[in-house]
Amino acid sequence: MTDRFAPLIPDQFNMAAYVLGHADRSPDKIALSIVSPRGAQRWSYRQIKQAVLGLAHGFLDMELTAGDRVLLRIGNTVEYPLVYLAALAVDLVPVPTSAQLSSHEVAKIITEVTPALIVHDPAVATADADCPVLSTSELPALYTGIPAEFVMGDPNRLGYLVYTSGTSGHPRAVMHAHRAILARQMMHRDWYDLSEHDRLLHAGAFNWTFTLGTGLMDPWSVGASAVIPVADTAPDVLPLLMKRHDATLFAAAPGVYRKILDRLDAPIHFPKLRHCLSAGEKLSPRIASRWAAMTGQTIYEAFGMSECSTFISASPHRPAHGDVLGYPQRGRRVAILPADPDAGQMDGPVPTGTDGIIAIHNSDPGLMLGYWNAPQATAEKMRNDWFLTGDFGAQQPDGSIAYLGRRDDMMNAGGIRVSPIEVERELSQVAGIRTVAVTDVEVKADVSIIVAFYTAEHDIADATLAAFCRDRLASYKIPRKCVRVAELPTNPNGKINRRALKQRTDIFHGET
């Protein structure tokens, strides 16, 4: 039986043609505004499509052929989505990468994906490669060239590669099909509540996959307008831009909301804003409640990953309550599976309220085709018909999912598994704490303790934090040590790098 909420997959399809379909219906509508306090650079749907297909023709003139990889080493500029869509338009495979990567990291990627072309912004690090390198300064000359034709084909064919954030220690190239964009229709309805009338302002950079999907591909797919701040826009400027450019939706990572709140000294009203969106890492209840109090707006959170984008979310028509993350989007098949069925546990979904691994069915059109040149790693992520996310959660009686953290991040307290998310949620409510990350750190061989790392104006006594936790957490979950740091380490995707925190054995120097 076909799920009426699942997207229809056509026999012939091209992701770029789908995303830019409104260029033929509303060619003069503004598709993109790149904004600053000084003004805006605007692109119509007609201009976006012309630039994309002009670039695509230029790529073909370089004798690139279907399946060739195009590595994007581009900064926070409009060239990023244009090159991405141009490659997709003619069956090349774009490989978007973070501008923060070092030359050493880029060299590894070049070895892995063997690009046929690198599009390079001179301000961004790259590495030597046995392929042509096209400077971003050369791209505008191609925008007005002869437009290429969209190459239609099997919707299940390889469309693009994206790299994971490397939470397991090794970033992997994830293969996605052209059809993956269609799975995002379930997000439009059950996260964004998105329509062609919206103006979605995304606080992220062009060269971040969260911005690329939520901030650009999705608005364009429905004929809406995307609004992106210029590079290096300060967080305290974002409220002004939201007002001035009539944003109806605002999307950002949790850290951006926190930075805006830290600079607000009075409540603020956004006349056109309907609601806000958050993803990338867990949104703390404290940030969500502070934002609601200062703006009157609700932040709707979503959970996903490079391998499947977002598939659990809250939305205006189905808000999350309490500490839950949200609900499986309609059209998705999501389950909580036992962490270790080989230890005598059942193989199917665990009972309601029981912790386990969040899994999504392998029939999901947004699920990856696999990891690039890594069939064994791909197989290890599958259990029967389910893809294992590596994240822990528990399903509630109403179907919502409570998020408990990455499997890799789970801590061990005397043999009892503890979620860092649970501890962080409580500590984030302590007055004075701005950000917090919790992990276990080895004190000596085979002995680890739970440590909380936090940012704040001043040190907060361990005893004060322990007393705060005592009424809220079981004793074995309370951090044995709390350390104030200047900032929390993050990986190139902006997520907290707990692996780096686990290595902080220096915090025990001088202690017995």
Give residue ranges: language-model regions.
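Conserved AMP-binding/adenylation subdomain of ANL enzymes
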Residues: 182-199, 207-249, 263
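AMP-binding/adenylate-forming catalytic domain of the ANL superfamily
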Residues: 474-496
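Conserved beta-loop-beta connector loops within the AMP-binding
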Residues: 335-361, 397-398, 458-462, 497
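Conserved pre-ATP/AMP-binding loop-to-beta segment of ANL
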Residues: 12, 27-30, 145-163, 170, ...
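Conserved AMP-binding A3 loop
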Residues: 42-46, 159-183
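AMP-binding/adenylate-forming catalytic core of the ANL superfamily
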Residues: 101, 118, 364, 369-370, ...
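Gly/Ser/Thr-rich phosphate-binding loop
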Residues: 247-252, 261-321, 333
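Conserved AMP-binding/adenylate-forming core of the ANL superfamily
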Residues: 31-77, 81, 85, 102-107
